[in-house]
């Protein structure tokens, strides 16, 4: 497959095709990925986000990789939902150090009706600062997605984690179909999708290919595709898994770039374990988004000044924020605003 033909947006990838991409000689794969990348992005710009945990620990889900799960003893301090003002202060700090997108994550199976008004205030406040907004709150219903869209949420993160075939080995408290359903509700409400997965959980090459097939064969590609490397946390069932081969991780980024040519491919969790050379190779493979700052939910992340020093050495600059939604998403958001006028989600939270 030529680099030119691979840059065409497709939604009909087969397992054989994707495995053939993975099995190319390393240099050929990276050349193809970089060629595709340059057709759609400035190769020397990287989108910069900051992620804040707005509610930490005691999650009822049993994701085997996650230190926030209430099923495992990881020594993580449990915290209630943050006050809106503290979230806004953190967002202001993120903007000051160069982030253009502020992502808020809560350890929930799904947000409760009691918490939704506070969550919506967070979105409105961060949006008012001129930052793009992103949240990950677990499973959503249609009413909740419409409320978030009406509040100004730009992106919703809901990872598929792995292939449908391997998924049951990692989590039993939420089905794959439920994850896909949430993504469909997010899209219907006019928000953009952030969805990816994790390497290093014991999955096979077929599973890695299967994850990318699920993402690329959605009706619309996710605008953001985070590729995580497992951060092994003592107390979780995956704490003793073998390390991911760095070249295998780079291959995953490159294949994601080829299959989803217009998506931002995010170098996400696990970056603390990557040296500068591996990160540079990741950018060459087509990764063009990072989380920036000291913490990534509950695990360490390279410090902001180290990121900027690496950017300077590589001649990379942070991507500027897009100020306007495209017409399709804007129309859907306006419809959500109309439908939201009579929403039952707005109530007196003091009651």
Swiss-Prot record:
Q: Which SUPFAM superfamilies match?
A: Radical SAM enzymes
Q: Which InterPro entries match?
A: Aldolase_TIM, BATS_dom, Biotin_synth/BioAB, Biotin_synthase, Elp3/MiaA/NifB-like_rSAM, rSAM
Among Gene3D superfamilies, the record links this protein to: Aldolase class I
* Annotated SMART domains: BATS (SM00876), Elp3 (SM00729)
What UniProt keywords are attached to this protein's entry? 2Fe-2S, 4Fe-4S, Biotin biosynthesis, Iron, Iron-sulfur, Metal-binding, S-adenosyl-L-methionine, Transferase
The record's section on Pfam families has:
BATS (PF06968), Radical_SAM (PF04055)
Query: What does the function comment of this entry state?
Result: Catalyzes the conversion of dethiobiotin (DTB) to biotin by the insertion of a sulfur atom into dethiobiotin via a radical-based mechanism.
**Biological process per Gene Ontology, one example term:** biotin biosynthetic process
Sites where the protein binds [2Fe-2S] cluster? 103, 134, 194, 266
Q: Pathway, per Swiss-Prot/TrEMBL? A: Cofactor biosynthesis; biotin biosynthesis; biotin from 7,8-diaminononanoate: step 2/2
- Family from the record: Belongs to the radical SAM superfamily. Biotin synthase family.
Q: How is the cofactor bound?
A: Binds 1 [4Fe-4S] cluster. The cluster is coordinated with 3 cysteines and an exchangeable S-adenosyl-L-methionine.
Q: What name appears for this protein in its UniProt entry?
A: Biotin synthase
Q: Which organism is it from?
A: Stutzerimonas stutzeri (strain A1501)
Gene Ontology MF, one: iron ion binding
Q: Which reaction does it catalyse?
A: (4R,5S)-dethiobiotin + (sulfur carrier)-SH + 2 reduced [2Fe-2S]-[ferredoxin] + 2 S-adenosyl-L-methionine = (sulfur carrier)-H + biotin + 2 5'-deoxyadenosine + 2 L-methionine + 2 oxidized [2Fe-2S]-[ferredoxin]
EC number(s) of the enzyme?
A: 2.8.1.6
HAMAP family reported for this sequence: BioB
Q: Which cofactors does this gene product need?
A: [4Fe-4S] cluster; [2Fe-2S] cluster
Domain Radical SAM core stretches: 44-262
Assembly state and interactors? Homodimer.
Q: Which domain of life is it from?
A: Bacteria
Please tell me which top-level EC class this enzyme sits in.
transferase
Could you say which residues bind [4Fe-4S] cluster here? 59, 63, 66
């Amino acid at each position: 497959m030529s680099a030119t033909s691979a840059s065409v947006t497709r939604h009909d990838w087969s397992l054989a095709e994707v495995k053939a991409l993975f099995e190319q000689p390393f240099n050929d794969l990276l050349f193809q990925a970089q060629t595709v990348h340059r057709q759609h992005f400035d190769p020397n710009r990287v989108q910069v986000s900051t992620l804040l945990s707005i509610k930490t620990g005691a999650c009822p889900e049993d994701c085997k990789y996650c230190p926030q799960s209430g099923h495992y003893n990881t020594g993580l301090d449990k915290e209630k939902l943050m006050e809106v003002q503290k979230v806004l202060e953190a967002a202001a700090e993120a903007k000051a150090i160069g982030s253009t997108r502020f992502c808020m994550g809560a350890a929930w199976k799904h947000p409760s009706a009691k918490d939704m008004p506070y969550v919506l205030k967070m979105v409105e406040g961060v949006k008012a600062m001129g930052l793009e907004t992103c949240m990950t709150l677990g499973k959503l219903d249609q009413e909740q997605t419409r409320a978030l869209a009406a509040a100004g949420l730009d992106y919703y993160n809901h990872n598929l984690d792995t292939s449908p075939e391997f998924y049951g080995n990692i989590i039993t408290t939420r089905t794959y179909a439920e994850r896909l359903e949430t993504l469909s509700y997010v899209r219907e409400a006019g928000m953009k999708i952030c969805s990816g997965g994790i390497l290093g959980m014991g999955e096979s090459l077929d599973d890695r290919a299967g994850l990318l097939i699920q993402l690329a064969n959605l009706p619309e590609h996710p605008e953001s595709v985070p590729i995580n490397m497992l951060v092994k946390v003592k107390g979780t069932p995956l704490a003793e898994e073998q390390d991911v081969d760095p070249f295998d991780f780079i291959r995953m980024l490159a294949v994601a770039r080829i299959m989803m040519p217009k998506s931002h491919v995010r170098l996400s969790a696990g970056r603390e374990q990557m040296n500068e050379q591996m990160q540079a190779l990741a950018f060459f493979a087509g990764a063009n988004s990072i989380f920036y700052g000291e913490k990534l939910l509950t695990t360490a992340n390279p410090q902001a000044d180290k990121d900027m020093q690496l950017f300077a050495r590589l001649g990379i600059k942070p991507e500027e924020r897009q100020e306007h939604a495209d017409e399709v998403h804007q129309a859907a958001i306006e419809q959500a605003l109309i439908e939201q006028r009579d929403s039952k989600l707005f109530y007196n939270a003091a009651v």
